[in-house]
């Protein structure tokens, strides 16, 4: 059974396994997510479910959104995502998906928006080496050569240069769910995941399985 859920990153901590080894984990509040809509291959051309996460006040939703949520019989949600699944018959509109759909040992892919770093140079953005910091050096943190001179007389596309860093969609593949705290709808996921604390993430079964 393919599984997916929307969650929110709480932060990082560490736990100990049965051998006393320290495991760094990210704490994620996963669900509950309400099923808003089912899409079928006959009607829509593909199979998918649409889910919503985190309740919001009524004034924050416009009339079409209110109608969409009312049709599903669920409260207004802040985040809405669609997951392409083949086993949509196992889901019903109006029901909830909770953290216990996953189990300890599952391998998942986690997608979020990375932390924005603003405009950064090539040393921070692309791990370039810097020049000598000696008094006589005139080259410290500059980009250096950007290409040849008369031929081809231009800078190639996708050249690594200074620019906006972070604040992009990012996915970490094939990481392990260490522990599921079903009573609190919390997942402990091994290692770090994209985004800041309180950032929204999507957790799916890994594509590498």
Curated annotation (Swiss-Prot):
Example GO biological process: translation
Pfam families associated with the record: Ribosomal_L3 (PF00297)
Presence of the UniProt keyword RNA-binding in the record: yes
Top-level division of the source organism's lineage: Bacteria
GO cellular component: cytosolic large ribosomal subunit
Gene3D superfamilies: 3.30.160.810, Translation factors
PROSITE patterns: RIBOSOMAL_L3 (PS00474)
Residue span of region Disordered: 144-165
Function summary: One of the primary rRNA binding proteins, it binds directly near the 3'-end of the 23S rRNA, where it nucleates assembly of the 50S subunit.
Protein name: Large ribosomal subunit protein uL3
């Amino acid at each position: 059974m393919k599984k997916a859920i929307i969650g929110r990153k709480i932060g990082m901590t560490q736990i100990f396994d049965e051998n006393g080894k320290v495991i760094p984990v990210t704490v994620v509040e996963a669900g509950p997510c309400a099923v808003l809509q089912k899409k079928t291959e006959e009607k829509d051309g593909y199979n998918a479910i649409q889910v919503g996460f985190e309740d919001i006040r009524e004034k924050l939703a416009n009339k079409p959104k209110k109608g969409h949520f009312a049709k599903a019989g669920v409260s207004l949600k802040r985040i809405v995502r669609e997951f392409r699944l083949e086993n949509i018959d196992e889901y019903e509109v109006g029901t909830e998906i909770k953290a216990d759909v996953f189990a300890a040992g599952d391998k998942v892919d986690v997608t979020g928006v990375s932390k924005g770093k603003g405009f950064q140079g090539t040393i921070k953005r692309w791990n370039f080496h810097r020049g000598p910091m000696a008094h006589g050096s005139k080259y410290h943190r500059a980009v250096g050569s950007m290409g040849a001179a008369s031929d081809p007389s231009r800078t190639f596309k996708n050249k690594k240069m200074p620019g906006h860093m972070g604040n992009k969609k990012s996915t970490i593949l094939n990481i392990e769910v260490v522990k599921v705290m079903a009573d609190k709808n919390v997942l402990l996921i091994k290692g770090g995941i994209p985004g800041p604390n309180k950032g929204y993430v999507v957790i799916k079964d890994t594509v590498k399985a």
